[in-house]
Amino acid sequence: MIIVTGGFGMIGSNIVKALNEIGRKDILVVDNLKNGEKFVNLVDLDIADYCDKEDFIASIIAGDDFGEIDAVFHEGACSATTEWDGKYLMHNNYEYSKELLHFCLDHQIPFFYASSAATYGGRSDNFIEERKFEQPLNAYGYSKFLFDEYVRQVLPEADSPVCGFKYFNVYGPREQHKGSMASVAFHLNNQMLKGENPKLFEGSETFLRDFVYVEDVAKVNIWAWQNGISGIYNLGTGKAESFQAVAQAVIDFHGKGEIEKIPFPDHLKSRYQTFTQADLTKLRAAGYTGTFKTVAEGTKEYMAWLNR
């Protein structure tokens, strides 16, 4: 059996899809389905069972027997960078992750988890997987950073793979439940469907992000499991592209529209990453040779999926 936490979420459901594609359907999905809209992410996929997140944690603490587990993909967390309830974030993103990590270490189960480029904070270069380059700007980034630091402490003694991925700007299918936290491409497509022009913040031509297609993210996770990879790695394309490139790809798909600029919101000014670009040196050194879709390629594929 394979366990995917956050399996109804964007990245989790795409990992389930990637597992299905290699013939694995013996999947236990763990999630909090309070947001019932997320169920649509798995309706076309095959899983063996579902467990509520709180029940799952209780089972782990109680020492319940889950049978033979081949891997745990831990994608379940609060992913809202705008969430400032520190107690809530530390419970969901740190304490929960520690419980699951120790469960996997105790049973020698390969453990793959979601970290984030938010751990780097507002830097404009050297997105390198080392403590000296990490200075998160928000509580979400700090919760992810702290777990990375915890993993660094236990990695030298681990007898089974422990692998974290610092996800950069992930976009693509199965994110419609995320509301305001969904990708720019998703929101721009919705604006176009309403007959509006795609809207970007003023100055967005200077905002460069490493936009990585979610199916590429899932592929790297599967590769890491199949190859017994340990460590903490950046997961982006290695190339920063502009929000304008995203908007242009959406316009090109729809065959109409032009970019409209709107004022930059004051509440984001000191907490907004204006540049992200994954340094893939470590991932490539670990042996990953796969390619990553460009914004034009990924957005075109995503638009076709959204408008199918």
UniProtKB/Swiss-Prot annotation:
GO terms for biological process: ADP-L-glycero-beta-D-manno-heptose biosynthetic process; carbohydrate metabolic process. Substrate binds at N169, S180, H187, F201, E202, G203, S204, R209, Y272. GO terms for molecular function: ADP-glyceromanno-heptose 6-epimerase activity; NADP binding. It comes from the Bacteria. Catalyzes the interconversion between ADP-D-glycero-beta-D-manno-heptose and ADP-L-glycero-beta-D-manno-heptose via an epimerization at carbon 6 of the heptose. This is ADP-L-glycero-D-manno-heptose-6-epimerase. Transmembrane segments: none annotated. Keywords: Carbohydrate metabolism, Isomerase, NADP.
